[in-house]
A protein has these predicted regions:
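Amphipathic alpha-helical packing segments from all-alpha helical-bundle domains
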Residues: 84-89, 94, 106-108, 125-152
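Helix-loop "lid/cap" segments that line or gate small-molecule binding pockets
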Residues: 97-104, 112-122, 198-199
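Short, basic, alpha-helical segments at the C-terminal edge of helix-turn-helix-like DNA-binding modules
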Residues: 73-79
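Helix-turn-helix
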Residues: 21-24, 28-70
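Hydrophobic/aromatic-rich alpha-helical bundle segments in the mid-to-C-terminal region
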Residues: 124-136, 151-197
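Hydrophobic alpha-helical connector segments
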Residues: 70, 81-110, 161-168
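N-terminal intrinsically disordered/low-complexity leader segments
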Residues: 1-20
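Conserved acidic functional residues
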Residues: 54, 65, 76, 169-176
Length: 203
């Protein structure tokens, strides 16, 4: 129930209820896929978590692969896809550290990414194209940032922008896995900062 301008309670329309249900399904699928992966998690697991039938769930998402892609896009809409900092003038180091710390604060977001990214290399995985395109966007984005630093004379001698970009992404994914296994022993933001300080000259 909601309240209209006259103070009288009014019922929410079907669109609002449908949107709420979709968000509930996405949240449940996020939890299931993060814990069990795409292949290990089932539509019934998601439906049970939401408290609805699998048939009703399929009304919102026609297939399991549709649900997976919706969850991945939902994740990026909540956390950012890493390619467009909110402030284009934000320094690369600051943008990376901010994103890493932000991701740590959202329950399950790193688990979901790590599990599904690893699964996506297998044949026939519906997330393969998503992750392939995502890595291509990330490499292009970070290559542009490192190229800009090189033009400003701030990239250390011998460091190539393309290699620095690919290495940053590889480190980030790898350190996330270590952090998931031992969160109290791994300083994710500190490791990323350390790498960037190795390749970027101070101002």
């Amino acid at each position: 129930m909601t309240t209209n301008e006259a103070g009288r309670p009014s019922r929410r329309g079907p669109y609002a209820k449908s949107t709420e249900r979709r968000h509930a399904i996405l949240g449940a699928a996020h939890a299931v896929f993060a814990a069990r992966g795409y292949r290990g998690g089932s539509l019934q697991d998601v439906a049970d978590l939401v408290g609805m039938s699998q048939t009703s769930l399929l009304h919102y998402f026609p297939s399991k692969s549709d649900l997976l892609l919706a969850v991945l896009n939902w994740r990026d809409s909540n956390t950012g896809d890493g390619t467009t900092p909110p402030d284009p003038e934000e320094a690369l180091v600051d943008a990376v550290i901010r994103q890493a710390r932000f991701n740590e604060e959202i329950p399950g977001v790193i688990e979901l990414y790590t599990v599904l990214c690893a699964e996506s290399v297998t044949d026939g995985h519906p997330g393969r194209e998503f992750f392939t395109e995502r890595f291509e966007r990330l490499r292009r984005s970070y290559t542009r940032r490192f190229t800009q630093l090189a033009e400003e004379g701030r990239l250390r001698p011998g460091v190539q922008p393309e290699a620095a970009a690919a290495s940053l992404i590889a480190l980030w994914d790898g350190i996330q896995t270590q952090w998931l296994l031992s969160p109290d022993s791994v300083d994710m933001a500190g490791c990323l900062r350390g790498y960037l300080e190795l390749v970027i000259l101070p101002e």
